[in-house]
Amino acid sequence: EMFKEIKEKLKITPYLNKTLGISDIQLASKMIQGSENTSSIFYKNTYEVVPIPNLVFGKSQPVAFFYTEIYNLQSQLLKSEFIKMRMILYNSKGKLIKEKSKNLSRNSNTRVEVGSQILSNFPTDSYTFVIALIDSLSSTGISTAKKFFVYNPDIVVADTFETSTTAVLSSTFG
């Protein structure tokens, strides 16, 4: 019997951050609130969050669900009574597509945030979903982002390319 022994030193730095924190955004194809399927590998905090590994939504998968966890809401470093949560969606050109805000109570130290977005009318493109948490009184904030794709071949985008020949013509000929 052949074997090889490898010894290596590994330094692990524990995550001991005492201020506001947020997990990565998990995008999902399906989310079941209050799931009783606690043995599922997709079970988290009473939700069954079924991932979508290719991150492609649109005609065949019209709804994107998201799941994220927020930590240390009761940190002494935070000054505001509420933490502002901004959910922002950008297209591949950086254009703001949608924005929504809400205030998060600090009555518990951790919380789960979930939501959904219908994408059946979005044109084919790549998008970035950003969640930002802001403590306005201490002027601090954190954010996390997730890129995903929408494929909707039936949605025709009006060309937004604008031209202005007037300035060029007048400078050349005027």
Feature map (PLM): residue ranges:
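Intrinsically disordered, low-complexity terminal regions enriched in Ser/Thr/Pro/Gly
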Residues: 1-174
